[in-house]
């Protein structure tokens, strides 16, 4: 019988090997094995705490908008940053308990550009003049560019199959109340509390984009339709991953998958968002791509058939189940197509415009840029200006924003980092798909890869946190078979010294 191929050790496996090596060294040097086991147990407890912290960040990314909108709108500008101290705590856990991944070139690059970004901001302040506006925009800009990228690598190193299964189930169960909320928002008046929030002051209310004269685009638990788009797209990725997985290894009944799929599709139907639809189509294309790469005729066929069947059912039932939503969406699509008639390639051409839009600013911005954060929406709201120019109005796409914020040299470097990270992640997904025939890595990459390459990664808070979190989940999915429930691996520690595994109500 031929020997099984030896797979490259993942970061967690390297850590386990390191623990075993330390145990052998301790035995040879007379150190108690129990002491080594206790140390390993402490590290595992820290890993589990890190997982819970990341899940808390994920839940805040979903519900932070609801808190700002329905609970405490007067503190909305502070609640917006509530995730950041938790992320810093996650970094402290990684540093204190050696949870960071190996020093791969891409991980080192993410940390190096974060440090460079800090010095860049100080240099911009020294040469451009320090002010309260520059400080506020600089802190916000640094956060948008650099804070969450290292977290993706830590998630990829420390999340195991049980942790990913928990994230998937949280997301899918949340599709049910979110679908109800989206329907309520769609059928409610534009100025109703469910759409604008509980604030009496006009400036504290959240006015979404209009869908037609009578309806506003649903935002779900977020403050904008962009946030809902991220939630729906990632939920659709999990739905397809579960639907494609063979039944014995799915870990979730087919009826439950069908219910979650229906809830997700209803969110698409009533969102009024073309971006949501197109992103889900892209994820469906990712499922077909998985079918081309996967091994096994049955799995290949299922990966192609499932998204096509879902699409056919959605097209057939959309005007029947949601006639008002269908009419509003088709009118919205027609109106947008008229506006985009000037773009070569229509909506696709507009989406790809971001790849070349930044070139017009290459010679038009200062060498150091106008300043971190000056190309974002916050700069527009504050009417920030430099030498009589409002930089926030110069950039519509994310790559153009890099030119405004960082200048042509560092801005181009950050673009290269984004593209390089996406290519590196895609290579990991390719290898995982060929090795394990698991659909989840490809499904998550269909979302995260798009966001990292061309999404408003530094221009919108929800896209920023979702993009890097799901890049991390994708990395973790590449390490194993996350949708297949499996018994806990045997531990080298005595049973009495093993830390109990925390269980959550949804696990």
PLM features: what roles do these ranges have?
Residues 49-69, 84-147, 451:
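N-terminal hydrophobic segments of proteins, predominantly signal-anchor/transmembrane helices
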């Amino acid at each position: 019988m031929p020997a099984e191929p030896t797979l490259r050790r993942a970061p967690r496996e390297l850590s386990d090997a390191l623990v075993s090596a330390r145990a052998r060294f301790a035995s040879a040097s007379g150190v108690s094995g129990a002491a080594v086991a206790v140390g390993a147990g402490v590290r595992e407890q820290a890993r589990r705490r890190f997982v819970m912290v990341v899940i808390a960040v994920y839940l805040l990314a979903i519900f932070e908008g609801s808190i700002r909108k329905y609970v405490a709108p007067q503190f909305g500008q502070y609640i917006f940053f509530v995730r950041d101290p938790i992320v810093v705590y996650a970094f402290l856990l990684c540093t204190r308990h050696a949870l960071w991944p190996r020093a791969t070139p891409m991980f080192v690059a993410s940390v190096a550009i974060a440090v460079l970004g800090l010095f860049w901001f100080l240099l911009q302040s020294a040469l451009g003049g320090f002010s309260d506006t520059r400080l506020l925009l600089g802190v916000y800009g640094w956060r948008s560019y650099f804070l969450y990228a290292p977290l993706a690598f830590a998630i990829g190193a420390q999340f195991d199959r049980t942790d990913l299964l928990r994230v998937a189930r949280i997301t899918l169960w949340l599709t049910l109340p979110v679908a109800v909320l989206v329907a309520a928002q769609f059928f409610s008046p534009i100025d109703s509390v469910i759409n604008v929030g509980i604030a009496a002051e006009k400036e504290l209310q959240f006015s979404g984009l209009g869908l037609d004269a009578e309806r506003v685009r649903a935002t779900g638990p977020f403050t904008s339709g962009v946030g809902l788009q991220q939630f729906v797209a990632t939920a659709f990725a999990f739905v397809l991953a579960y639907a494609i997985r063979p039944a014995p290894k799915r870990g979730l009944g087919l009826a439950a998958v069908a219910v979650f799929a229906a809830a997700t599709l209803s969110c698409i139907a009533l969102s009024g968002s073309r971006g949501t639809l197109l992103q889900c189509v892209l994820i469906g294309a990712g499922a077909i791509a998985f079918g081309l790469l996967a091994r096994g005729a049955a799995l290949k066929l299922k990966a192609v058939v499932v998204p096509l069947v879902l699409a056919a059912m959605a097209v057939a039932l959309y005007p029947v189940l949601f006639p008002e939503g269908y009419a509003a969406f088709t009118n919205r699509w027609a109106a947008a197509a008229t506006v985009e008639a000037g773009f070569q390639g229509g909506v696709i051409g507009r989406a790809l415009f971001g790849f070349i839009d930044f070139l017009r600013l290459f010679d038009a911005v200062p060498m150091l840029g106008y300043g971190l954060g000056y190309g974002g929406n916050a700069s527009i709201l504050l009417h920030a200006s430099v030498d009589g120019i409002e930089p926030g109005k110069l950039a519509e796409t994310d790559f153009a924003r890099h030119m405004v914020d960082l200048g042509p040299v560092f801005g181009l470097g950050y673009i290269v980092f984004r593209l390089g990270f996406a290519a590196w992640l895609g290579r990991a997904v390719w290898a995982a798909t060929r090795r394990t025939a698991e659909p989840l890595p490809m499904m998550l990459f269909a979302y995260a890869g798009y966001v990292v390459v061309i999404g408003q990664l530094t221009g919108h808070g929800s896209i920023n946190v979702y993009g890097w979190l799901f890049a991390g989940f994708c990395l973790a999915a590449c390490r194993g078979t996350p949708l297949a429930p499996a018994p806990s691996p045997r531990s080298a520690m005595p049973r009495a010294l093993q830390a109990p595994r925390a269980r959550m109500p949804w696990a």
